[in-house]
Swiss-Prot record:
Entry-linked Pfam families: Glyco_transf_20
UniProt xrefs under Gene3D superfamilies: Glycogen Phosphorylase B
Lineage summary: Bacteria, Pseudomonadati, Pseudomonadota, Gammaproteobacteria, Enterobacterales
Enzyme class, spelled out: transferase
Site (Involved in alpha anomer selectivity): W85, I155
InterPro entries: Glyco_trans_20 (IPR001830), Trehalose_OtsA (IPR012766)
UniProt-listed Enzyme Commission number(s): 2.4.1.15
NCBIfam families: PRK10117.1, trehalose_OtsA
Protein name: Trehalose-6-phosphate synthase
Pathway: Glycan biosynthesis; trehalose biosynthesis
GO MF annotation list: alpha,alpha-trehalose-phosphate synthase (UDP-forming) activity
Family to which this protein belongs: Belongs to the glycosyltransferase 20 family.
Amino acid sequence: MGRLVVVSNRIAPPDNKGGAGGLAVGVLGALKAAGGLWFGWSGETGNEDKPLKKVTRGNMTWASFNLSEQDYEEYYCQFSNAVLWPAFHYRLDLVQFQRPAWEGYSRVNALLADKLLPLLKDDDIIWVHDYHLLPFASELRKRGVNNRIGFFLHIPFPTPEIFNALPPHDTLLEQLCDFDLLGFQTENDRLAFLDSLSSQTRVTTRGSKSHSAWGKSFRTEVYPIGIEPDEIAQQASGPLPPKLAQLKAELKNVQNIFSVERLDYSKGLPERFQAYEALLEKYPQHHGKIRYTQIAPTSRGEVQAYQDIRHQLETEAGRINGKYGQLGWTPLYYLNQHFDRKLLMKVFRYSDVGLVTPLRDGMNLVAKEFVAAQDPANPGVLVLSQFAGAANELTSALIVNPYDRDDVAVALHRALTMPLAERISRHAEMLETIIKNDINHWQQRFIRDLKDVAPRSAETLHRNKVATFPKLA
């Protein structure tokens, strides 16, 4: 078996010394083990005609390219993030479909296939990541590539009622069948994909996870992404920076509810604020004795939907503090800024409650990081949305419906008053799962399964080859 070739929308620079998150950690671990290539967008626009930038370190090579302003707008902003992202997070009301954006999305996937093709070797295995690159295997197949190609979707896959509302849904489904292995975060996501596929064409299934559709054979499997628990525990348990140590001392008699999420409508942040207000309403005995800190750095600030949610959170935070605050006590701290990941792990460790309640999330690694950062002898309690992929694994968390403010409020009260023995027991069960299903286990399982797939024959490629771009009727 040859090299591993990883393809993602963005690549982590080889000289990046910062704390890498989910995808980067898993990809780097896999590439170091197998040797290979990481191919993706540089994050820069302009000078798109210049040659690929290549950097080699040992047995690993990074190859990156620039996008034109038009390609960036149509492929990334207008289709990936204004059509696929909201739809896959069950927000059809926020989808802004435009035909030029769909054509740009298709064009860039074809362009990327053209750029990668000269770099490929016959025995490479190719691992493609996330919703930006749904047509990528199809474009490679058109160019005669019969290598094993796997795909992992980091975000949820919506039900047919949602997915089939997208005008190019049928084309996207057929393109996905050009992958040999399709990986999902949860069983619900895998089944939602198969349900959407079955609504459009005849699907033949052998066993439970080997399928054929449109004359193409592929496998589906569930691979819940993990974290590096040992690394997080080490970051969390180290000495505190002076300002954080001072803050901890000042809050020694206050119970801390802590939450950190990217500012995104899928994270359920307004609902979180309302649930905290319900806690203050229902359980006045906590007044002056708790503090909820929400860190939510700006994401996609140029998009109106994200501007709206930022303004909503600022308004809600001011209203709640104005209603319940006292001299010397501010019940809610909302910080719209970025903090170093290592610092956040230390904050997790001294927090009494981790509040992770997205409305829809593929996995949510923050939930796993909170658990890994805790002191096993005196752990905090995780309150977790039933709609986060992590809820399928972290069953000892307090699982809540984020749309039910009273349900979340009751869970917060229970977390704040939970006896030490129960906290230790729940934490130990979750930590065991996180250690067992860490980031290395995730990537090793996926690559092992991809290697086990039989390569496609030249006859199959010729039969399925399409000469033109997909167009909407």
